[in-house]
Amino acid sequence: MASNESLQTTAAMAPVTIERRVNPNLDDELPKPFLPRALVAVDTEHPSGTPGHQHGDMSVLQQHVAFSNRNNDGIVYPWETFLGFRAVGFNIIISFFGCLIINIFLSYPTLPGWIPSPFFPIYIDRIHRAKHGSDSEVYDTEGRFVPAKFEEIFTKNAKTHPDKLSFSELWNLTEHNRNALDPLGWIAAKLEWFLLYSLAKDPHGFVPKEAARGVFDGSLFEFCEKSRKVKQATVKSLTFKI
């Protein structure tokens, strides 16, 4: 049987381990939390993943990207990324710059060959090659979802509410995850979490845990798109009645 010291998650000489705590009993709340999940994004509230979300035999990282693959051919072009941004509710300016940044920086690592493409396509089957540093490590290097790392986002950073993150807590999250000499990773992480905050914050200015989890498997994007369509249909119906 392991000694108490061998199971300690804090060290007195390393105050950061006390400030940013982990859940020592996570395996009581979620089966095999350190096992990377290839197909579903699970947490303590959703041990089977997102209800109704179809994984299509894709990795969780691939599912995240596949939302923007509007014609389902396995390749995401800049104009598809733009349409994906628009589908979830971002304005034209954010959508335009978002598609440029994402496709310019992520295209080349996913290409099947060495010659760059002027169309900046992102190949979904190779998206794991485009994983940047200074991230939360919720995706492993093959694009699987690591539940323990996802839970750490909240145990380490959610100081106001255990299942929500404020803007300042999201900022601190990106600061805590910084790797040395990785400016591109620092910027990418902040942009990603800023976009999530803009998209999913509640009326009190917090990002719920469920929204954060939904980003990783793309189910949040699907929810936002469906919600916008319902809202647009309702407005259109009311307009006709008037």
From Swiss-Prot:
Location of the protein in the cell: Lipid droplet; Microsome membrane
InterPro entries: Caleosin-related (IPR007736)
Keyword Membrane among UniProt keywords: yes
Motif (Proline-knot): 112-121
Gene Ontology biological process: negative regulation of lipid storage
Modified residues (N-acetylalanine): 2
Main subcellular location: other
Note describing how the cofactor binds: Binds 1 heme b (iron(II)-protoporphyrin IX) group.
Enzyme Commission number: 1.11.2.3
Class in the EC hierarchy, top level: oxidoreductase
Known role: Calcium-binding peroxygenase involved in the degradation of storage lipid in oil bodies.
Family membership: Belongs to the caleosin family.
Comment text on domains: Transmembrane regions are predicted by sequence analysis tools, but these regions probably constitute hydrophobic domains associated to phospholipids. The proline-knot motif may be involved in targeting to lipid bodies.
Protein name per the record: Peroxygenase
Organism expressing this protein natively: Pinus massoniana
